[in-house]
Design a protein with these regions (language model features):
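An N-terminal hydrophobic leader/cap segment in hydrolases
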Residues: 4-63, 73
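Short alpha-helix in the alpha/beta-hydrolase fold that links the catalytic acid
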Residues: 100, 230, 239, 253-262
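Conserved alpha/beta-hydrolase
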Residues: 101-123
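Alpha/beta-hydrolase active-site loop
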Residues: 127-148
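Alpha/beta-hydrolase fold nucleophile elbow
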Residues: 148-160
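Hydrolase active-site cap/lid region
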Residues: 168-223
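Short beta-strand/loop motif that positions the catalytic acidic residue
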Residues: 236-238, 243-245, 249
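Catalytic active-site module of serine/aspartate enzymes centered on a nucleophile-bearing elbow/loop
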Residues: 284-311
Length: 311
C-alpha cells in the first residue's frame, strides 16, 4: 500500500513539475534581445536607420485595459485617412514590424507599430498568444480612432502570434478593421502547443501533457488554451483577409493557414510562399509578397471604397 502511494505521489509530482515547466515556457517564453532584432533587421535591409529616423513620427503610450502601458510609434508621412496597425510575433518587438510598415507607407498608408504585452517597451507580465493581446489590440484601435477620428480606412497586419491576435480580435471582440493581413498564424493554440511538445519534448505524449499544461495555465494566467483558437471564430470575420504562409514553415505548419482560409467566409485571398521558414515569407519572397498584397488591396480594399491606389 505504501509502495503504491509512493508511486502515485511520484507520478503526481512529476506531472506537477511538468505542468510548471510547460506553463513557464508558455507564459515566459524567452524573448529576443532588442539589439539582436535591430541588428538582424538592419543587416537584412529591412530597416535603414537613417530612413527610419527621417520619418515624421512620434512615440506614444497607449493604456491597456489591464493596467499596463503599451508602447507604440505613430508614423505619419502622408496626409491621409489610411492607417495600418502592425502586430509583431512572439519574442519580437515593434522593430520587427518596420519592414511591414514600409510596405504600407509605400502604398500611401500611415502606420502604428507597437509592442505586445511583455515585449519590447510595453508592460505586462505574461504572454498569452492572443488571449490578452487581442484586448490590447482593441485598445490600440480605439486609441487611433479617438486620435484621428472614426472615418479611417484601417488595416491590421500581423505576423505569427500577431496574426493569431488580429484574428481573435476580429472574430471575438469586433470586426473593427476594413481589412486584415494574417502572416503565418496558428489556427488553434492547443494544436500548436501539442505539435511543439511532440517536436521538442519527446519523453511524454502531448495527449498527457496538454491537459496538465492547460490546468496550470488556467491557474496561473486565468485563461484556457481552448480560448485561443482563431479557427473557432474565423466565421465571425466578414471583412477581407489576406492569408500568408511559407510552404516550408516547420514551426507553425502551413496547413493551419490553409484551414483558416477554407473556414473563412466572404472576401479572402491566400498566398503560399515557396521560400523561407517561419515568418520569412516576406524576406524570402519579396517581389511575390508585394505583388499579392497589391492584388489584395486593389480587389478588396481600394476598389470597394472607390479609392485609387497611391503611386
Amino acid at each position: 500500500m505504501k509502495k503504491a502511494f509512493r508511486v502515485l505521489f511520484s507520478f503526481l509530482l512529476l506531472l506537477a513539475s511538468l505542468g510548471v515547466f510547460i506553463s513557464n515556457k508558455v507564459m515566459f517564453l524567452k524573448k529576443k534581445d532588442d539589439e539582436e532584432i535591430f541588428n538582424r533587421e538592419t543587416e537584412a535591409g529591412h530597416l535603414v536607420p537613417d530612413e527610419y529616423d527621417a520619418l515624421p513620427k512620434r512615440e506614444v503610450t497607449i493604456p491597456s485595459s489591464f493596467g499596463y502601458a503599451l508602447k507604440a510609434v505613430l508614423v505619419e508621412p502622408h496626409d491621409t485617412n489610411r492607417y495600418i496597425i502592425i502586430a509583431h510575433g512572439v519574442t519580437q518587438s515593434k522593430t520587427n514590424s518596420v519592414k511591414y510598415m514600409n510596405l504600407f507607407l509605400n502604398r500611401g498608408f500611415n502606420a502604428v507599430i507597437y509592442d505586445h504585452r511583455r515585449h519590447g517597451e510595453s508592460g505586462g507580465k505574461t504572454t498569452s498568444y492572443g488571449y490578452y493581446e487581442k484586448f490590447d489590440l482593441q485598445s490600440v484601435v480605439n486609441w487611433l480612432r479617438k486620435e484621428k477620428g472614426p472615418d479611417l480606412l484601417l488595416g491590421i497586419h500581423g505576423e505569427s502570434m500577431g496574426a493569431a491576435t488580429l484574428l481573435l480580435y476580429a472574430g471575438m471582440l469586433e470586426d473593427g478593421a476594413d481589412f486584415y493581413v494574417a502572416d503565418c498564424p496558428f489556427s488553434d493554440f492547443s494544436e500548436q502547443l501539442a505539435y511543439r511538445i511532440k517536436e521538442e519534448v519527446k519523453l511524454l505524449p502531448p495527449k498527457l501533457l496538454l491537459p496538465v499544461a492547460n490546468l496550470f495555465v488556467r491557474i496561473r494566467d486565468k485563461y484556457s488554451l481552448s480560448e485561443v483558437s482563431p479557427i473557432a471564430v474565423i466565421e465571425n470575420i466578414k471583412n477581407p483577409i489576406l492569408f500568408i504562409h511559407s510552404r516550408m514553415d516547420d514551426f507553425i505548419l502551413p496547413s493551419m493557414t490553409e484551414a483558416l482560409f477554407e473556414q473563412k467566409q466572404g472576401p479572402k485571398k491566400l498566398f503560399m510562399a515557396e521560400n523561407g521558414l517561419h515568418a520569412q515569407s516576406y524576406s524570402q519572397n519579396r517581389d511575390q509578397y508585394e505583388k499579392v498584397l497589391d492584388e489584395f488591396l486593389e480587389e478588396y480594399v481600394f476598389a470597394g471604397d472607390g479609392i485609387v491606389a497611391a503611386d
